[in-house]
C-alpha cells in the first residue's frame, strides 16, 4: 500500500510503499528537511536495492544500496564535477573503479 509517512525525529517525509505494519518496503522516495532526497527501493525501512540519493550539497549517488548504504556498483557525482564509477562497500569506494576529477585527471584501479 502506498503511504505518506513523516519521521518524528528527523522530519523526513516518505512517500511510497509500506507493508501492513507501516514498514517501508518496495519503491518509495524520502525527502529530508535539508533538501536531501532518496528515490528507489526499500526493505525493512532501509534503502536496499537500486536507488538514487541527491545530497543537499548537490552531490548525487546512483546505484546499489544495502542496509541504507552504498553497497555494490554505483556512480557518485560531486557538485564540483568530479565523479567515481565503480564498486562500493558501506558508503566507501571499495574495489575496482574509475575516478575522474574536475581538472580532467583520472585514476582507474583498486580502492
Question: Where is each model-derived feature located?
Answer:
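Intrinsically disordered, low-complexity repeat tracts enriched in Gly/Pro/Ser/Thr and acidic residues
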Residues: 1-111
Amino acid at each position: 500500500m502506498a503511504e505518506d509517512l513523516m519521521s518524528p525525529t528527523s522530519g523526513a517525509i516518505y512517500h511510497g510503499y509500506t507493508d501492513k505494519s507501516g514498514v517501508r518496503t518496495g519503491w518509495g522516495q524520502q525527502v529530508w528537511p535539508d533538501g536531501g532526497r532518496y528515490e528507489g527501493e526499500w526493505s525493512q525501512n532501509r534503502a536496499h536495492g537500486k536507488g538514487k540519493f541527491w545530497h543537499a550539497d548537490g552531490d548525487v549517488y546512483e546505484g546499489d544500496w544495502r542496509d541504507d548504504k552504498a553497497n555494490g556498483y554505483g556512480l557518485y557525482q560531486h557538485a564540483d564535477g568530479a565523479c567515481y564509477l565503480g564498486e562500493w562497500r558501506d558508503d566507501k569506494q571499495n574495489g575496482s573503479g574509475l575516478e575522474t576529477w574536475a581538472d580532467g585527471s583520472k585514476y582507474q584501479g583498486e580502492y
